[in-house]
Design a protein with these regions (language model features):
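Internal nucleotide-binding/catalytic subdomain
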Residues: 4-121
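A short beta-strand motif that forms the metal-chelation/ATP-contact edge
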Residues: 51, 122-132
Length: 172
């Protein structure tokens, strides 16, 4: 999740963020490696992508809009909406970028959850992971697809194509 993700624009903010994240890590698991990943903040509108891979082919189950700005310093997610109100060419760019990211890290089969930001320079992948979406968002997929997320994932695990179409049913 976004626990421990803190935006820091200046060195004093970075120092305070490191102390805070180290406390979170120590509380979560005192034996865990306390390495911290520091990344550049990418401005833009954020989307989540849920899909499945079958023999390396990516099939999108849904794109979720994150309509509330996630500009920090903390990144609490409040609501996901699907389908997003975006142009067809932007949807295509998001899906192509996620598929390329999956190939780049060697993912070929199973569920995919990705998060992207879109700005004037293009689509930026923030995360791509071989897992399903968390929280209550799986229920949104059922509303949009007519199948439960579990049914789709089990079918994919058995080697069947997901063969689902998002009928455009709004959910959020």
């Amino acid at each position: 999740g976004s626990r421990g993700v803190i935006r820091a624009d200046h060195i004093n903010e970075l120092s305070a963020a490191i102390v805070r994240v180290q406390r979170i890590l120590k509380r979560e698991n005192p034996h865990l490696d306390r390495s911290i990943l520091i990344e550049k903040f990418i401005e833009g509108h954020e989307y989540a992508v849920e899909g499945v891979l079958c023999s390396g082919e990516f099939q999108c189950l849904a794109i979720f809009d994150k309509p509330d700005p996630l500009d920090g310093p903390y990144f609490e997610e409040t609501i996901y909406l699907t389908p997003p109100d975006i142009r067809n060419d932007l949807e295509t760019d998001i899906l192509k970028t996620v598929a390329i990211a999956c190939r780049a890290i060697g993912l070929t089969h199973g569920p995919i959850h990705a998060e992207c930001r879109v700005n004037s320079k293009g689509v930026w992948v923030l995360e791509v992971a071989p897992r399903t979406i968390g929280g209550q968002c799986g229920r949104l997929l059922e509303l949009a697809l007519g199948l439960s997320l579990e049914e789709v994932i089990m079918s994919n695990a058995l080697g069947h194509s997901a063969c689902v179409e998002n009928d455009g049913q709004a959910a959020g």
